[in-house]
Amino acid sequence: NSSIIESAITSGTNVILKAQRNIYVQSDIIATGSSGGDLTLNAGVDINISANITTANGNLTLEANNESISGRGNNRYSDIDISSTVNLGTGDLNITLGNSNTTGSYDVNLSSATINANDITITDSATDNSQPSDLGNFTASSAINITSNNKYLNVNGASLTANGAGTAVNITSKYLSGSGSVSTPNGIWRATNTDTSSNGGNFGGFTGNFIQYGYSSGDAIQGTGSGLLSAYDPGNLFKNYQV
């Protein structure tokens, strides 16, 4: 019952919902005030949020495809989908999609989501590269950190804004697909592609101050400011000029 959850969060009480398989949020959860409790959704398989969530500055944690939950079954479709508005104020958003031998749809789909939070952290550990995760409209008062080491990310139509200092947006994936935008008015952003094939040269429409090819984790970064780092090494580049 969403009203019970609303009342608990409004009073500052932390709420944890745990399911062997799926969690669906189909009614708005709108906490009021400014000292809301934290909300955690922990599912053995899926989390699907189609209603709006406001936590009154509480944190929101979403964990799906959690193999530590007994009774989840095998070969389940595992996703985290948000198609609504999530407003956490000064609260943090943490999204984690675990990895297993699950077959089928296997991604974090936020393409229709509008998310406002302090920090936004997304970790997609799934391995089915045919099911890339999709980013949406994110605004963070501090930082956005996204990791999808095993798959590429779809940023088509995505808008990422982080207002913190330093590296306010940090993305690591095989590569970026589509055409999105990124803004860090008080800091910089970095996107790291780990794919060593030519796909590693795809940066989803993001343009920075520099591109560094042949990059491996731990290498010295040659450029300054916002930039693109790629494991892809195109070899020697040259251009013939006719005079």
What are these language model-derived features?
Residues 21-22, 46, 67:
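Acidic Asp/Glu-based divalent-cation binding sites
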